[in-house]
């Protein structure tokens, strides 16, 4: 399984790719799509093009993205929503199922507490993936999203397996 995590942003969109094999997580790639265009349509196209390029290079089988969170600034929320929508649409166009996780869920899965600081997320991502240095914040967040997705999908598989067993016992 190859998982693509996306940390959407209107100025920087982070991405992280991990591979899971034999219940072990391996680092594949991470980075940031730097948004340099001025107009909103061109900025959104730049996000879509960047994600498409990542999909073409790394061929993920699953994708995950951070849910939108509360913003003090309404315009900031709108811009983030646009970036997130373009990212989700690009993933869907490329036939990837998209799972969504809150910042609290992601931090809980990676650090063990939903109130973790960004530096703690970076440190744990570095440790879990055996990286020689801490990844940049946006890339670390995207890798954390991918790791959270793996842990969540593993838990869901156990739960669905348990329900099949219990259904057999009832019959």
From Swiss-Prot:
GO terms for molecular function: crossover junction DNA endonuclease activity; DNA binding; magnesium ion binding. Mg(2+) 2 binds at residue 66. GO terms for cellular component: cytoplasm; Holliday junction resolvase complex. Transmembrane segments: none annotated. InterPro entries: RNaseH-like_sf (IPR012337), RNaseH_sf (IPR036397), X-over_junc_endoDNase_Mg_BS (IPR020563), X-over_junc_endoDNase_RuvC (IPR002176). Its main location: cytoplasm. Keywords: Cytoplasm, DNA damage, DNA recombination, DNA repair, DNA-binding, Endonuclease, Hydrolase, Magnesium, Metal-binding, Nuclease. It catalyses: Endonucleolytic cleavage at a junction such as a reciprocal single-stranded crossover between two homologous DNA duplexes (Holliday junction). The keyword Nucleus does not apply. SUPFAM superfamilies: Ribonuclease H-like. Its EC number is 3.1.21.10. The active site is at residues 7, 66, 138. This is Crossover junction endodeoxyribonuclease RuvC. The gene is ruvC.
């Amino acid at each position: 399984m190859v998982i693509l995590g996306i940390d959407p942003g209107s100025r920087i969109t982070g991405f992280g790719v991990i591979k899971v094999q034999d219940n072990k997580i391996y680092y594949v790639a991470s980075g940031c799509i730097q948004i340099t265009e001025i107009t909103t349509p061109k900025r959104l196209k730049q996000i879509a093009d960047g994600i498409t390029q990542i999909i073409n290079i790394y061929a993920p089988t699953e994708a995950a993205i951070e849910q939108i969170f509360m913003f003090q600034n309404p315009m900031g929320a709108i811009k983030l929503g646009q970036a997130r929508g373009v990212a989700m649409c690009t993933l869907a166009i490329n036939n990837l199922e998209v799972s969504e996780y809150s910042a609290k869920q992601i931090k809980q899965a990676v650090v063990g507490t939903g109130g973790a600081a960004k530096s703690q997320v970076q440190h744990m991502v570095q440790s879990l993936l055996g990286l020689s240095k801490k990844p940049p914040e946006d890339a670390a967040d995207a890798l954390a999203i991918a790791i959270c997705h793996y842990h969540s999908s593993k838990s869901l598989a156990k739960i669905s397996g348990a329900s099949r067993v219990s259904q057999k016992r009832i019959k």
